[in-house]
Amino acid sequence: MAAVGPASPPPPPLWMHRDLSRAAAEELLARAGRDGSFLVRDSESVSGAYALCVLFQKHVHTYRILPDEENFLAVQTSQGVQPKRFKTLPELIQLYLQPSQGLVTTLLYPVEREETTEDRDYSDGEDEKPPLPPRTASTSSMTGSALVSTDTPPENVTAANGLSTISHEYLKGNYALDLEAVKQGANSLPHLNKTLLSSCKRLHGEVDKVLCGLEILSKVFDQQSASMVSRMIQQSMSQGGDQELEHLVTKLAILKDLLSSIEKKALKALQDMSSSTPAISPLLSIRNKVIPVQTFEVKLDVYLADLTKIGKSQKYSLSVDVEGGKLVVMKKMKDAQEDWNTFTHDKIRQLIKSQRVQNKLGIVFEKEKDKSQRKDFIFASAKKREAFCQLLQLMKNKHSNQDEPDMISIFIGTWNMGSVPAPKPLGSWILSRGLGKTLDEMAVTIPHDIYVFGTQENSVCDKEWVETLRCSLKEYTDMEYKPIAVQTLWNIKIVVLVKAEHENRISHVGMSSVKTGIANTLGNKGAVGVSFMFNGTSFGFVNCHLTSGNEKIHRRNQNYLDILRQLSLGDKQLNSFDISLRFTHLFWFGDLNYRLDMDIQEILNYINRKEFDPLLKVDQLNLEREKNKIFLRFAEEEISYPPTYRYERGSRDTYVWQKQKATGMRTNVPSWCDRILWKSYPETHIVCNSYGCTDDIVTSDHSPVFGTFEVGVTSQFVSKKGLPKSSEQAYIEFENIEAIVKTASRTKFFIEFYSTCLEEFKKSYENDTQSSDNVNFLRVGWSSKQLTTLKPILSDIEYLQDQHLLLTVKSLDGYESYGECVLALKSMIGSTAQQFHTYLSHRGEETGNIRGSMRVRVPSERMGTRERLYEWISVDKDDMGGPKGRTLPPRTSHDYVKPTSSSSSRKHGSAELSRVSEEGEKSSTSRHTHTKEENTHNRGKQDPFESDATTCKNSFNNPAYYILEGVPNQSAALASDILPGSALPPLANKTTAPPAGSVGKSKPPSGSSAQGRWQTSGRSVRPISEEGSSEDDGNIGPHTGSLNRPPPDFPPPPLPKAALEMSENSFGKPRVFSDLADGKIPPPSKPLVSPGLTPPPGGAPGGGVAFCIESPPVLSPNSAPFRRGGGASALDDQSCSVLQMAKTLSEVEYPSGRERGASQGPTGPQLRGLSFPSHPIQEESIAEDLPEEGGLWGAESSSSSLSVDCSVGEWLQKLGLQHYEEGLLHNGWDDLEFLSDITEEDLEEAGVRDPAHKKILLASLKQQQK
């Protein structure tokens, strides 16, 4: 073991936290809990600057420490105040450890970073000896030995891992000496050299043996190279000392060249000797440039109402001639007679997919000049229907009059190659053939526009790998593809190839990589990324290889967050946003290494039975996504193929789940390690057409995975009307914005607006309202006076409807972001303001929500638009009601709440086209109007009330996710003992108060909607934590079933279904944004008495007060809490969406006065929110004048509280327990309003030790609440 020298650098101060996020800093300070606790972290807004964070009265105060031109450091001060400058950070902190230095409080208690076991563990699980990059010959040799170490018997493992041991010794000790030497000006690394020489002693002899053998073989084919080998061997025998390592590298380089060229030389020599021409094997699958005519056998779907058709032959064949631009509809008659009609591409008006019947398709034909007809056909399978749609879209695109495409197809492939070169035929991977959701044989003939290949453990050099891919594409598509980007990090590679015709449409190509390997310094794990613009649409692609090992979930999560933050791709002006918000479409794929948390034998049994649902429920990636730990709002197609890892090499029949390591036998359960996820801006078009794996490529222990996507793109818009005059200028105007951010800070905030449609980013003024109902959250608001009117560079609606606006909420004290989001302008266009509501995120974590009212004003001269190709296909919810089974994903990632005004109704055309009967005809005017408008809603602007039934809200109720741990008496979440023992479904069978004027027209909610909405595995085609309202959100409950209650102090998150079912009372649904959905401002109401909650015995863990329903059920104390794969309980690991939480902070139901008077009573079942016992936060809100109609926020009543007529002292005196007054007041319980939330632990902290006295006090409080 190498000894650590005396020159080791001193450890950093306890208060110094490099690379710590603002949110994590606030959590550390909250856990410390003492005034004067402090730490210093890197600034998120200024490179090279720091942020001093101080806790005082439960609020975190942040001070920026900025370097000046001379690299002196100073705390940023108010204008006119002379800053105090210091050479080093410790000197600066030393000053502020003294009292009265201008900070909010003296720095007293440095806070250390909590170091977990995984933080200290620098090994990489299974990969103790990572394969080295393939660029030099030495790395090839290392890769070979690495392969030996996994497959050789245990007695050879120690020798094989010699380099690993020496490397670890160097990283733990001697590298610090080299670092010190470099700081002192050294140009070499003696300790590293020594480490490498000792590691490579045996390699010298092995290389010499191989070279001697190759010398003999070389003499047969090439005398020149043989003599060079001889000279090299003689030279190497005389070398030693400092030059030894250099000559070893030279030998290895020659060995590499010799090995790669000897086969070619031998082949040439043998060909010269042979007089016959070698036979060339035919290509496996040559694709003609001309796509052949494809024929589909279908049946006509006859409506029962059309009795004249019943009994007649309804068999048809549909022939698609892509090259000729026509569709032949042939009806099969008796006696071999046929009747056909030919429709050119311009006569096919629309395709309408049925959601309820997956193999049904409606086709609307233009029959005559101004008439249309619809026919519904039943295909042999859903796959055949999709192939037909793809061919027709290709035909439309090919014969379109547009110069630029509206839609492209993208192939994404990911494969861990296992350090073995790929087999030559890669057809099944390229053609998306194999297991899972695959393309129909008729559709695989269609070449994709862009191919993106991500590989891991790829030992092939870049040039050779790109050539292999190009040749494979040429072989199977008969088209030339151009490589536009290749990025490599060790053995992690990404290659992007595009059709030659698209080469000039691609610009702004960017590439980047991030290392997350051992100690985050080695590139054996990490990510490579590529970004570019395709005309006006931005794309990002990330290929990653994350930490292996079944138990390394936290480290994989951290790998993802590091990549998200450090990968430098996309527009540099968007550096305030992580890469998940920088691109119209972001694809993230690779060997993510998330495993299955289940016994190996159970896993194998489920795989043998092809039952994947139980496995997907214990898939670590799905579980972590459900908890919002990673891939926030990303989507993944449904998995319907077996786990892709770990197979026996050479076949796909057997999983090899044991692996010999230096530390012993390791179990690798079969898992879906290789995945493809994506995230797109709201109101954009993207459809996943295939997602599966191959079953015939067997060189690696992983199977290659493929996914194909249909993606809408925009052109580089050029206005036909030229630049707008001042009278024709479009405007983006905000009426108001309100945000709830997760922070213990109480600074002021402003908003920055970014968009490609703006010349430069714009800033708002600071917020003019600010309040807090919870110490860990802040509600901030901006009125129209504080918000800037934005002027787009182009005013045409055709341009603006494809644009998006990025918002970031930043603090005035540190100019650091507290949350970012993206809004689509498409739904905001109109003469009246539209409302938006979406989530905020920062560094991959959900940090709150934001809502507001805005409009995009477009001058009438610029209103002309056209139908996009992808709008040509719509989705029909069918005449039977809602969709059944799995449905297509919603097109939006945020909710648009449409007011019930004439402005919204104008967007609904005439009757739905999907309702037109088979022979129904209508005028072309009506048809054109409807076609466009229906598609706008189906594809672009999904109603909260019409969204997919499978799109659910996460209701994970983990207080640790949305409160800062360690803050006493502040939690507002379910106690662990009322969490159900399975995944937590959201509220079911909810009811809401109807809007004014709708009494008697309401319909009861669907009783079966809850089952359709909740999926623990997140397997529907949607972002797992999507916050779009589901169908039953739009259902309006009966008038009498509405619960009328005043706004609580702190409304709790939604209760899980199990908690509701255990209650004796029947609760209605708390309507989400009822005031917004109804388009009305609720009438102001006076505060009403709100009964307190009955806390469960013992309160909530961590000193918090749990909330529950009155008359709580008796729960078994022995019931085990819900647990996930790492053994963490639900309270520790189940995460509540911050958006769900923030909604409850900002939403209340306001009943009308008559309803309130009729239904309120002291015995009515009600929920009460929590108030806080100590240091109540004063509201700083500035009154805002609201318009009488159309305003976003209603006049809110003040927080309700326990109605009291006496002080705490008087109350205690009545009970004869006045001696407890001093203890209660000392602990902040100075008002009966707060005492309603006190628990037994709180009473003990206040000095109430006697159990009988505690019982008297709690019973008295309960009685007063009633």
UniProtKB/Swiss-Prot annotation:
Residues 1203-1266 form the SAM domain. Its main location: cytoplasm. GO terms for cellular component: cytoskeleton; cytosol; filopodium; lamellipodium; membrane; nuclear speck; nucleus. Keywords: Actin-binding, Cell adhesion, Cell projection, Cytoplasm, Cytoskeleton, Hydrolase, Immunity, Membrane, Nucleus, Phosphoprotein, SH2 domain. Tyrosine phosphorylated by the members of the SRC family after exposure to a diverse array of extracellular stimuli. Residues 114-159, 879-951, 986-1132, 1147-1174 are annotated as: Disordered. It is found in: Cytoplasm, Cytosol; Cytoplasm, Cytoskeleton; Membrane; Cell projection, Filopodium. It is an enzyme of class 3 (hydrolase). Residues 994-1012 have a biased composition (Low complexity). InterPro entries: Endo/exonu/phosph_ase_sf, IPPc, SAM, SAM/pointed_sf, SH2, SH2_dom_sf. This is Phosphatidylinositol 3,4,5-trisphosphate 5-phosphatase 2A.
